[in-house]
Amino acid sequence: MTTNYVLVETCALVQNRFGMRAIKVFQEDIVPVLRIEWIDKAVHHAAMQVVIAAPRKKLSLVDCVSYETMRLLGVTTAFTLDKHFKEQGFICLPA
């Protein structure tokens, strides 16, 4: 499971590092097999409130949207190298 916010972030990264050809491959070969949760206004607002209230500068809106979505869906494990997911109480793979 991923969110449309993560897709936007990923597209920007792929385009910047690998170019438009890689974006086409990503869109045609990878996106169709993903379960995508489309973020609504309520989740966006809740995540933004966390960002605004956060004591640290490096807390991203995309990460906060992911945390909120995972909690709402009962997801406890994340495939990520981002240590912030562990700080938020999620199990991270690879460990």
Where does each model-flagged region fall?
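PIN-domain endoribonuclease scaffold, especially VapC-family toxins
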Residues: 1-56, 68, 87-92
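Histidine- and aromatic-rich ligand-binding microenvironments
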Residues: 2, 59-60, 82, 94-95
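Acidic active-site catalytic centers that drive phospho-/nucleotidyl reactions
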Residues: 9, 63, 82
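Acidic, metal-associated active-site segment
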Residues: 60-76
